[in-house]
Amino acid sequence: MSYLHASLLRKRTMLIVRSFTILLLSCIAFKLACCFSSSISSLKALPLVGHLEFEHVHHASKDFGNRYQLIPLAVLHPKSVSDIASTIRHIWMMGTHSQLTVAARGRGHSLQGQAQTRHGIVIHMESLHPQKLQVYSVDSPAPYVDVSGGELWINILHETLKYGLAPKSWTDYLHLTVGGTLSNAGISGQAFRHGPQISNVHQLEIVTGKGEILNCTKRQNSDLFNGVLGGLGQFGIITRARIALEPAPTMVKWIRVLYLDFAAFAKDQEQLISAQGHKFDYIEGFVIINRTGLLNSWRLSFTAEEPLEASQFKFDGRTLYCLELAKYLKQDNKDVINQEVKETLSELSYVTSTLFTTEVAYEAFLDRVHVSEVKLRSKGQWEVPHPWLNLLVPRSKINEFARGVFGNILTDTSNGPVIVYPVNKSKWDNQTSAVTPEEEVFYLVAILTSASPGSAGKDGVEEILRRNRRILEFSEEAGIGLKQYLPHYTTREEWRSHFGDKWGEFVRRKSRYDPLAILAPGHRIFQKAVSYS
């Protein structure tokens, strides 16, 4: 009888616990529903120049990575900076009783939901871009342009070229917003010389997580200025930026050569980025694995210096390394530059029969990736999953990394480029939030693979993600000491490890400028505290 009594007691206890759990969850759900209803009502009452969209919001629930989909409560289309500040200040004043968060979205080129927020507010930053770009000090040694944080770099190029000027540092793809690239770093082949884009900013206007509008420079509000640059949107939203300019060339001499040996390829790259006087203006490189017909495709836009030898070059599936160079030209110095280029190339160790050159307009060179985008869109191959992996690898470990990754883990590069090139750490400002390896020279390794939707094979998302994990695991086991660029982690411990010595400063800045963790929740670094009482 005692056993039967105990069994009935356990069942009754379980029933009570289950009932209480259901009641508690129902109360929370009811509370959340009331909160959402209250949030919508209060947001609709905000005096905005622009507007909040509550119905057609699905376009803001995906990004270029095409792997995450978080549906927001609303999308803000700001027509003024005060629209952004008022919205954030309103959420800040609601305190922990609101679970609303805010994500700034430019072109949605994030890879893993970083510009998304579930049941929060996405700010469509391009709504700010109609503000006119202002170019200043055109005839001075230090010209600059003031632009909206939602402005596209391609538009900045078009406008500044009217004055014979252009920004010094770029990204490979120009159809991105200023605020988006400055929140990360902004790297391309000019970075060895000028540093990333975050090293070429004079001033910022920021809306903090409290809804404050602050102007900042290296001297004014310098803590916020340094924190926001490379800060992954955690401390504020960039609404305006002052970008350094330089005289723009008219043409570009564009060069590609091939190597069979990675060590020789890397040695030449390092020699070029350290050369006195910087003999080239742009230096990148990429890895070619299992690609057939490559040189034939180059002949569509490049000219072989030795066409017969180039046509006879056979690599039979071997891994190749392409060094890509550019020298800026003006009509009055073209012959001199061509001679300098010839002399510099003679010092390099590439396969001599694989020298390909062309001359293109400066604008066409900078916007070269957009040409590929147009082609991929026409084939329905642009809006596919992009499980990219971007790494910063210290110089002392790059050969070991190449042997392990390019020699074993990667089997082909037909579904996207693998970019490899070195930069000088001295051109990066260590006071910013951007994280790099400790060595003076480190490499960007960008494995930019596109996945085939629905594929379960080697071109499928899961297989590519498995390969990415293998690369990271190999690097960890080999002690490579790399850092992720455009990082994605899921735990506080991983973020702490990523930031290293900068973690304490990062947390302090978050507490100061966005203490409720309202901003940029898609990075999953900080969790917003919510009270259900």
Curated annotation (Swiss-Prot):
The enzyme's E.C. designation: 1.5.99.12
Organism classification: Eukaryota, Viridiplantae, Streptophyta, Embryophyta, Tracheophyta
Cofactor needs: FAD
Domain FAD-binding PCMH-type, residue spans: 68-248
Residues annotated as glycosylated: N215, N290, N424, N430
This protein's GO CC annotations: extracellular region
Organism of this sequence: Arabidopsis thaliana
Residues bound to FAD: A104, G106, R107, G108, S110, Q114, D172, T177, S183, I187, I238, Y485
Coiled-coil zones: none
Subcellular location: Secreted, Extracellular space
Summary of the function given for this chain in its UniProt record: Catalyzes the oxidation of cytokinins, a family of N(6)-substituted adenine derivatives that are plant hormones, where the substituent is an isopentenyl group.
Entry keyword set: FAD, Flavoprotein, Glycoprotein, Oxidoreductase, Secreted, Signal
The name this protein goes by in its record: Cytokinin dehydrogenase 6
GO MF entry, a single one: FAD binding
Catalytic activity of the protein: N(6)-dimethylallyladenine + A + H2O = 3-methyl-2-butenal + adenine + AH2
Main localization of the protein described in the UniProt heading: secreted
Tissue and organ distribution: Expressed in the vascular system of roots, of young growing leaves and of the most apical portion of the growing stem. No expression in the root apical meristem. In flowers, restricted to the vascular bundles and transmitting tissue of developing gynoeciae.
Signal peptide coordinates: 1-35
Enzyme class: oxidoreductase
Family recorded in the similarity comment: Belongs to the oxygen-dependent FAD-linked oxidoreductase family.
Modified sites of kind Pros-8alpha-FAD histidine: H109
